[in-house]
Amino acid sequence: MKEKSRILKKANDDPSRAVAFNDSFGGGDSQLRFLLKYLPDESFKDINLILSNANHDLIEKDKINVLWMHHFVNQKETENLSSKDFVNKLDWIVYNSSWNFEKHVYQFKIPESKSTVIKNAIEKIDFVEKPKDKINLIYHTTPWRGLVHLIKIFNNLNLKNVELNVCSSTLI
């Protein structure tokens, strides 16, 4: 568990994150937890795994630098991807979807040769019959993708048999 602990400590101690990793359960953070759960510790030897943050300070010269980018091109954490110097210091950039990969390649001219996609995944779900008289909705993405509008509209609808669950990675 030495390597996994190192990766987790770095993610949690990153001062540039809006929320500490241990307190964050967004998509990228959940994906890292799955990766750590299913891959053996030795898989992370010599790897510097950087979570969705193109910050020069997170590069480690003696490691294989892998940026795992879950953010869209318009987020401040992606800005340094426009710097050829920064991109040259990365060994790999891993994207969470083909769509996100394509947008980054287009926006930042990222070399496809140092990019790959590991699609989002979830644990297996055992489906059980649910009551038909209540509808449960979930908002599972970042707040800046319209959460403020959703909450306002949802409250205005005043629906009696519909519940909205918000699962976001930053404070509202």
Language model feature labels by segment:
Residues 80-91:
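A conserved, positively charged/aromatic
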Residues 124, 131-172:
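Conserved catalytic-core segment of nucleotide-activated headgroup transferases in glycan assembly
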